[in-house]
Swiss-Prot record:
Source organism, top-level taxon: Bacteria
Protein name: Putative membrane protein insertion efficiency factor
HAMAP family xrefs: UPF0161_YidD
Main subcellular localisation: membrane
Organism for this UniProt entry: Koribacter versatilis (strain Ellin345)
Coiled-coil stretches noted in the UniProt entry, renumbered to this chain: none
Subcellular location: Cell inner membrane
C-alpha cells in the first residue's frame, strides 16, 4: 500500500503538478511532504500527516519550513528525554 501511494504521488509530481501554478507555501512541498511522511510513518499515519499538511496549506498562512515529524509515537520524546537525563 505504501509503495502504491508513493508511486501515485510521483505520478502527480511528474504529470499533473507541472500543469498547475506553483502554490505550495511550504518547504518541502506538500507532495514531497506526503511522500516522505508515507515512507517514514507508513500508509495510514503518513496519509493522516499529509492530509493535515494539505489543510494547513492555504493563502492565509505564511508557510515556510515544515518538516515531517520523525517521532513514531507520542511517547518517543519522553523516552529520549529520560534517557538523556539519565546520562547526565
Amino acid at each position: 500500500m505504501k509503495a502504491v501511494l508513493v508511486q501515485m504521488l510521483k505520478g502527480y509530481k511528474r504529470w499533473i503538478s507541472p500543469l498547475l501554478p506553483v502554490s505550495c507555501r511550504y518547504v518541502p512541498t506538500c507532495s514531497e511532504y506526503a511522500m516522505e511522511a508515507i515512507s517514514i510513518h507508513g500508509a495510514v499515519r503518513g496519509s493522516v500527516l499529509a492530509l493535515g499538511r494539505l489543510l494547513r496549506c492555504h493563502p492565509f498562512v505564511r508557510g515556510g519550513y515544515d518538516p515531517v515529524p520523525r517521532s513514531h509515537s507520542c511517547c518517543d520524546d519522553k523516552i529520549s528525554t529520560t534517557a538523556h537525563d539519565a546520562v547526565r
